[in-house]
């Protein structure tokens, strides 16, 4: 008898061990798959952000339209967020995440497809009708009393080239691909977090969530490194002879291999989807048990009485839920602390979203840095500063057990640092370049009041130049000219590197003592003073990134503490919806429209319509961009002051229900911080 009991115990122990091993292995596989999907998610998101300027140039569109394309991700996300939030927990979560990753990858690949159907990139459309010929032999010189065949009028360009550019609306595919990526990314975070929270060992959820978010951070670094590499590559690499390409990555017309980034991220996303289709709905149950449960469920649902009862109960349940939803929504919208919180976080995050979207354009126009260099420094310096700042902020909150007032003060410090950094940037704005025909007269002797319709000078009036051309050359006098023809250059060194133009009459007007009236291809570089400002600018960016990330961690905890526990999920969801709709969608559009107002020279596409901007007034651009950011951040300080005042007033009054449970929700708040941290990271990683 004893031996029989011993054998039974041994068998039960072995069975228990097998179940634990099966559960552990299934959960570990899910954790590994989710970590990989976080890497894919981060890769796709950052590739889009750092490619937006290149997309703008490739498709010859304005910054505001490029901002709309960037915001299409949030549009896609909003289309399905309600469906995923409601039905996600009732369906097979791993498979739903796998479908999301598959859609995310498909969207990224769709985004890259226009590259293969648009033909070769023509960076000099005004002077070059054949898209396969970007060689230096097509550069226009000044031929007095003669009309160059290459200097065609706009009507000739339209007649011969407009039909060839029938793919000018291919940006719509980029829009749709980015929207599809937004749809696909929706289930990854909420369903992944809930799965971990349901099946992780008690007390281990925070550790697992931290691990997943760290993997997401590595994806961000990887994305910036890839972006830096692809930005160096010419867009048509592998299709054209690169020795004939006369522009460099510092040229405002340069377009890197933007499509490669989307191809890579798309493939990675599709690969990341595969493991989820082989994971169980519940890692605690073996396959046989799940099949039996499913069979019993089918038998029950075949019972007509049960169906009628279930239908009646379901109607009551839905009615109760709808009524409860609107009551809950009314409750959070009549909570003054929550309303103030939503407004100031929207304003604060809008500033970060604008910076992330347009930082490459800003640095390029202000300091002449290439996109490749900017991406590299962001990935190596700014992004780690954000990561360290966020973990430091979480540590400070937990170590000092900050109250609601303490969290608000931490957020106030973050906003103050960000505001001061924007004010400092005003002193780091470089003067606009000296460009004949835009900021100076063509002879280079006098500034102009407006860059519109600057009259020709006697040094180039007989050259029969096309004033719409943008083929900049830098004269020995330090002035940039719109083209060799408008500089009055009579000859060139041909295809030899570097390309030099000689006998430039507009350069001669300045009266150089060495009589070397020449110009070389490309815009004139920034002076040493501006270069020094660029280094100071980036140091402030990194410090701002760290200090602001420390404060931004308080937002994830604040949203939990200011509402009742049962309204937490709704409060977070509504806040996320506002951030996406009014922040993620609108901010790139209205900041892009503001940037467009500072453009001095627009390209003209083959149909005679306005294309992408070639050069901005860097002074006006800096003032407008940083000025709008200051206008967004200053009200944040005012609202945070009001927030702190209201909290203190409540803490001394009778209504202390919101504050009573602060200590009890600390662990839960830290868990939610790990859940929501990726929502704040992309908006701050360049700061």
Swiss-Prot record:
Cellular component GO terms held in the UniProt record: basolateral plasma membrane; smooth endoplasmic reticulum membrane
Gene Ontology biological process terms, A to Z: bile acid and bile salt transport; sodium-independent organic anion transport
Extracellular compartment spans: 51-63, 118-170, 228-258, 361-376, 431-539, 590-624
Domain of life: Eukaryota
GO molecular function: bile acid transmembrane transporter activity; serine-type endopeptidase inhibitor activity; sodium-independent organic anion transmembrane transporter activity
InterPro entries: Kazal_dom (IPR002350), Kazal_dom_sf (IPR036058), MFS_dom (IPR020846), MFS_trans_sf (IPR036259), OATP (IPR004156)
Transmembrane segment boundaries: 30-50, 64-84, 97-117, 171-191, 207-227, 259-279, 340-360, 377-397, 410-430, 540-560, 569-589, 625-645
Pfam families assigned: Kazal_2 (PF07648), OATP (PF03137)
Lipoprotein found in the keyword field: no
Annotated Kazal-like domain residues: 453-508
Disulphide-bonded residues: 459-489, 465-485, 474-506
Site (Reactive bond): 467-468
Residue positions the entry lists as glycosylated: 134, 151, 503, 516, 617
Principal location listed in the UniProt entry: endoplasmic reticulum
Function: Mediates the Na(+)-independent uptake of organic anions. Transports the conjugated steroids 17-beta-glucuronosyl estradiol (17beta-estradiol 17-O-(beta-D-glucuronate) or E2G) and dehydroepiandrosterone 3-sulfate (DHEAS) at the smooth endoplasmic reticulum membrane (SER), granting access to metabolizing enzymes. Contributes to the metabolism of bile acids such as taurocholate (cholyltaurine) and lithocholate, by functioning as a doorway between SER and cytosol, thereby decreasing their circulating levels and protecting the organism from their detergent properties.
Record's miscellaneous remark: Based on a naturally occurring readthrough transcript which produces an SLCO1B3-SLCO1B7 fusion protein where the first five exons originate from SLCO1B3, while SLCO1B7 provides the remaining exons. The resulting mRNA encodes for a functional transporter SLCO1B3-SLCO1B7.
Record-given protein name: SLCO1B3-SLCO1B7 readthrough transcript protein
Organism: Homo sapiens (Human)
Name of the gene this protein is made from: SLCO1B3-SLCO1B7
